[in-house]
Amino acid sequence: MIEEQEAPIQYALGEPARRTGLAGLSMRATVVLACGFGAFLLFQLMGLGRYAFTVVIPLTFAVTAIISIRVTGRSLAQYVQMMWQDYRRRSTGAHIYVSGGLSRVPGGRRRLPGLLARTETKVGFDSLGREFVAVLDRPRREATVILDIIFTGQTAMTQAERNAMTADWSRWLAQLSLSGDIEQIVVVVATRPGSGSLVANEVADIIADGAPEIARRVVLEAAAVISVARPEVLGHIAITVKYDSTSIKDDSFLNQLGTRIPGWASTLQWAGMMATPLSCDGLVSRIHSFYNPASEPDFERLMLDGVGHGLEWADAGPSVAETLAGCYKHDGVQSVTWEMREAPRSTFEDTLLQSLIVPHDRVVRKRVALC
């Protein structure tokens, strides 16, 4: 008897939440129309009706159109703002970032560029005694915790098991959304060419001391062959929590995070992910290797030897970086970013993002961030 295989579930996102005003326009466009109408009445009462018709009304409709018309997911006003910000950045030379002892960075450090330059790290321990690190943004009163993820979703499983994992992932997100203090959750899946150090270390551990020399050589050569330029998949989940100023000042937020992290990590296993809090050394090495890929083998060797790298959060950034219109250059490499213009309008299955996340032969390094 052949069992009937369960069909994949069709998912849908629905319509995004949107605040609408007059005639379906956005609230910002409605405010512009209201201000324009008020200015029109004021000009009429002042006896300046000609200016009301020739200046106020055209200007009001022009501003409303700039705010309302959207191209590839952004309004014309947002494009104008981005162009103005890029012009100001280039005119002041802020698009070129240089760190180190001879730079203008305070203390000669190699801080992360942009808004991350003002962040700092705080180390704590959860209720299970595991070390975790919180990236603190004091002006915004936000603390971000990073969970290191090992994905198990590519193992052989039935459609029913995949459906259950997808449902558990949705349930995990829904539980976090009900807490009220979580600002954002970002899932990052990164692929990179493996250096072979991790495979060689695993093989060395499983070889018995009394193994024949020919068997030992065969195993080591096989490990060397399969580990050359083989892609490795890294993943982490960043959870940003909002706190009050008192909790930020006395670092009491670390105790609160310490009680919540074990619950966040343990429930992820039902969604096919093994999660552990990322330590400060692990976070700094991962962020720095994103900016400077040449440092990855060094970090791996230090990790296998059980030696800390001694790099602080204030030195996790690049030495040199340049922001261009079509790419971002940093420490001898070049990165290009693509943004999803809009979410799928129709229904989709749970494998929608699989081709985007899995390693690709023609893309050596890539990172996919789901916000």
Each model region followed by its residue ranges:
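Hydrophobic, membrane-inserted alpha-helices
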Residues: L33-F43, T60-V63
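Short, hydrophobic transmembrane alpha-helix segments
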Residues: F43-G49
